[in-house]
Amino acid sequence: SINVDHLLASCGFIPFFPPTPIDGQLVVDGGMTSNLPLEAALEEAGTEDRLCIALDLFRRSGPDFKTVGQAMDRQLELLLSSQSWRALRALRQRHELRRQLRLLAEQIPEQQRKDPALASALAEGTHTDRATTLLMLSHAGVPQDTEMRAFDFSRPSLTERWEAGRLNMRHALESIGAQRAAPGEFVVHGFNGGEPSALV
């Protein structure tokens, strides 16, 4: 069961916040290894088409920094946003490999496809039948952002960010409209704030 220790651990972003001992282990913020776990949504078993909306609170592209605090903000943004884009790149590569396996399977006689040595590998190709649409929004900052904003939970800051997020989401949804991936496709629509963003 989840208790207050688990909540504390979820905020244990070292070195800013300490780890929390749980069951004999020191536990830290899961975002340190996977801040935006896309695999949990996109790799889940199933054959139905899927629309995934991912919100990345950190941006790859940001303003110039002039102070130590701004430099630390930028460092944190780069560390965490890079995780998201590496995960996205890996998912795209995996989808392409599966697509190629499916094409390969079509060229192999049915009797050979039943060979256990081939069957498990070729089965991976069946995971590309569904259509996958990913809408990925990165937070672009707000005018009143403070230094070390990742740790600013004041009411004015949160209100400003929530409103910016609401407007950015509305703009992104209006931009893609009814666009969806076709069967077998993995399509990504990226936005940095409210603006379309080039993706890896």
Residue ranges of predicted features:
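Non-catalytic peripheral regions of patatin-like phospholipases
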Residues: 1-3, 22-27, 31-200
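Conserved catalytic cysteine-centered active-site region
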Residues: 14-22
